[in-house]
Amino acid sequence: MSITSKVRQSVVLAADGQVQALVAGSAANITKANIMTIYAQASAADAEIKLYNEIGDAKTASALIFHGKFGTAANEIMEFNLPGAGIYANTGIYADVTNCDFFYIVGTF
């Protein structure tokens, strides 16, 4: 029996930027995805992650698809597990991170 899965991990980000995946050994923007898990480590208290369904750093309010806050100190780990099929992004995923050492998503893309 074989198992076929499209669940993957994004490239780890340590600052604001476009969420990417490795494709044939090179990083490429994720354009369509079902985000199932968001994983991060705080670099200080009051860490935040905002994900936008867009390419580029416009941070359009209407494109905000996720806003998570966590942490009371540095080095705290947070895992946001999203129910069902997760959050769908169909344009791209731009991440705005505050007080995070790193973050990545797990999903289908």
Set out the residue ranges of the language-model regions.
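C-terminal interaction-tip segments
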Residues: M1-T31, D96-F109
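Surface-exposed coil/turn segments at beta-strand junctions on protein surfaces, enriched
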Residues: T31, A73, G86-Y88
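Noncatalytic modules at the cell exterior or secretory-pathway interfaces
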Residues: M36-I38, A85-N99
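Residues on the solvent-exposed faces and adjacent turns
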Residues: A42, N53, V97-N99
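Short proline/glycine- and polar residue-rich coil/turn motifs
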Residues: K69-E76
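Exposed aromatic-hydrophobic patches
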Residues: I77-A85
